[in-house]
Amino acid sequence: VHWTAEEKQLITGLWGKVNVDECGAEALARLLIVYPWTQRFFASFGNLATASAITGNAMVHAHGKKVLTSFGEAVKNLDNIKNTFAQLSELHCDKLHVDPENFKLLGDILIIVLAAHFGKDFTPDCQAAWKKLVRVVAHALARKYH
């Protein structure tokens, strides 16, 4: 994947402002609410029966932070995303059996969360760069499935 200097700047510039705890929790909660079938991968998280139960669930918050923290590794390693996510791809494929389509869904949700949090700073060019990034990350996570 080739990144232009502008794309790199748009991604890293916005990432520096992201509250990983808040945005991570919100992104995972939105995934579980908007795409309820994804809840089956989080059965050990307890009550996910309602939107308020999901948004108030400490395990959802903790895992959302973990997911977004790991996403930060992509931002730090834009030129080596495949290798950065090799172990996570293996884990999600071989042990967790996560449908790789869910990585794309989470990427789409992350775009919505970033747009909501950053408003005017999340310009169309910024959105395009982030859309490219979430697709590259989703592809890297799905790599072991192919």
Swiss-Prot record:
Gene Ontology MF: a single term: oxygen carrier activity
Subunit structure, as described in the record: Heterotetramer of two alpha chains and two beta chains.
Name of the molecule in the record: Hemoglobin subunit beta
CDD domains in the cross-refs: Hb-beta-like (cd08925)
Organism: Ciconia ciconia (White stork)
Pfam families according to UniProt: Globin (PF00042)
Coiled-coil annotated residue ranges, if any: none
Gene label: HBB
PROSITE patterns: GLOBIN
Keywords per UniProt: Heme, Iron, Metal-binding, Oxygen transport, Transport
